[in-house]
Amino acid sequence: MNYEQKNIIEEKYLSKLFYTKDNKNRHVGVEIEYSNLDLKKSAQLAQEIFKGEIVEKTKYEISLKDTDYGDFKFELDAQLLQKMQDDNLFEKLGNIIGKISNDLDNFVDKTSKNFVPFEIAMPPIPISDFGKVDKLVQKLRLNGALGTTYSFQYAFGVHLNIEPPSQDIDDVLRLFKSFLILQKWIEVQSEVDIARKISPFINNFSKEYISLVIDIEYWPTKEQFIKDYIDYNPTRNRVLDMLPIIAFWDEDIINKYLPKEKINKRPTFHYRLPNSKVDQFRWFISQELQLWVIVELLASNDEVFNQMSKSFLKQLDNAIFNKNEWIEKCHQCIINHLL
């Protein structure tokens, strides 16, 4: 079953994400992973679009500062590189791989070309200006950047930090529920690569937790939602990571129960599903954001939302979850009732 995204979702629907309930610009932060294009060149390409000043701390830590939107960061996967440094792995590996021990740059270059991605972390950008992000993707592609599908080893992804229309728990939870309902359909549309599915970054929520959340009677207080989420998901490793927004709501509870997790508090969903298809000619990140539009369309339609919630819960109660049947039901619902 393959529903091509070419597209049941028209670009005009992206405008539904432009504003908050208070009629302010909604923003999305983007993190994109790739290889085969050095960070300084990447920063120069971004500067052509976003202006600003390039500041090179090291070859693997570069910033584009003072753009209209804030600062961009260009770096080797920071957590993995820090872990290697903390464990003194560069020196240990140097004893194994000989000459490379005398040339850290060569070693890191070799590592990043095979396993560790370069990453661009963008500041929050108004969704109405998202075309500039697509322009950067095009420049990266034309200059040789490689993405997820180039190699089985490349479990590279795109992370979208999507600002909800409000911080009200019911609004946020309604979108969270809608995502869980549509996730399998979105995975088909987004063509999530198997290398990413087996990587330790985008694990699914448990059936027990999904059943709890999808129940039409589940409309907890913000405090109860936080407690339930942390009880079931004491990890960043979720396809839709809610810990950043929970930290934004209550940083103390994160520090208390998850002191070892590195969490930057943000007033956003941290959506980690999409592949980084930066080397594919017809792909742009806005296509992934358009899929999120469907989540919001479902959340905003009370009748369809309630029907799909009940149907999904019924499917989950079955001994065997028929994924293809559910994907087809989602597709028909979207075509007939949401678009």
Which stretches of residues belong to each language-model region?
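C-terminal accessory/tail domains of diverse enzymes
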Residues: N2-F118, I125-K135, L142, S166-Q167, ...
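Short His-Asn-centered micro-motif
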Residues: P123, N161-E163
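Active-site palm subdomain of RNA-directed nucleic acid polymerases
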Residues: L142-S151
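Short, conserved phosphate-binding/catalytic loop or strand-edge motifs used
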Residues: F152-H159
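Structured core elements
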Residues: H159-N161, H270
